[in-house]
Amino acid sequence: MSPHNDAPSPAGSFTQSFTMSFRPVAGSGLRNSSSNTNSVYSESPLNDSQYSSSYSSTSLDTDDHMSRPLVPGVYVPTVCFFDPVTEDLDTATIGTHAVRLAKAGVTGLTTQGSNGEAVHLTHSERQTVTQTTRSALNAAGFSHLPVLVGCGAQSVRETIQYCREAYAAGGDYALILPPSYYAPLFSPASASVIEFFNAVADQSPIPLLIYNYPGAVSGMDLSSDIIIKLSAHPNIVGVKLTCGNTGKLNRIVAATKAGNKPSSLSASPPFLVLGGSADFTLQSLIGGGHGILAGLANISPKACIEIVRLYREGRLAEAQKMQEVVARGDWTAIQGGIVSTKAGMESWLGYGGYARSPLPHPTSNESAKWKEGFRELVALEKSL
């Protein structure tokens, strides 16, 4: 869990030269906000011909771009599966796993997240994973479930490319990390970070969710002030908080409520605020969050869903008891990352395989340890 660091940092002279601009996608229906027509992105808008894609919108089923609002609940960043020998994508298991999660009752799926080993995939492989997931859901009768797609990159240009490819492959929303390679040149509170998200949102064909995960971006931890400011963009619709800061979560929820009135449990909130780890599911809900987007739900979707249900029904003591089991199981996943998660899935579900190299294969002792670490959680999951 990353430290709770929610204080804004002063922007350096390098970042102070940047200005914000909004330029909606043509035909998107996005409202214009105050913009600077001299934006560094305004003179050469990207166009579809600049990118090649394995999938075009004309090859998709009509269900692939139906409206799928984001509603409160449990979202799962799905694991990506590979052939154990060749490390090629195992599309059969990718599709089967997506349907298993849908049948468990999750609210939506995410491809190309940390659990999906996005950093190990090529552009075309990312599209294959997303398209396989969307097609499997549609074929199994779950065409209503939204698919979020990790689209973060180090430049505005490539991030927009990922967003367009995600849309072409059937994705509904883009989950975006802030750029981090040149993090010393700008701070989490700087104009350049704001400019990055706004520039991507202006040209993305799908709405964005901000992904605040300091551990993956050189420690960059976006403040609640920055996230609240970005929430005003019509094409930025939510945030995933893997920082674990429930105080930040509470501030964002309070500032983005429509008319400061709580939204219906079944309605799409004006700005979706999700906890980024299952070990603080209940804490996120108590703080006003709308649910979680958590990797542990690959193993225990029903347990995560049950915590949400118990909380909504006012059965706090029961929810707390279940949260304790989930938190202990999540600690095993946190300690071993995707390696332990896949090992646990292999041990208890009969599939999971290995992460792509250079991540190591677990030793027999490690596999046994992680199997034991998930034992209590799996027993709970099977009881539901």
Q: Where on the chain are the PLM-derived regions?
A:
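C-terminal alpha-helical cap/extension of soluble enzyme domains
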Residues: 2-6, 14, 18-31, 41-43, ...
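Short, amphipathic alpha-helical "lid/cap" segments that border enzyme active or binding sites
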Residues: 91, 95-98, 224, 367-375
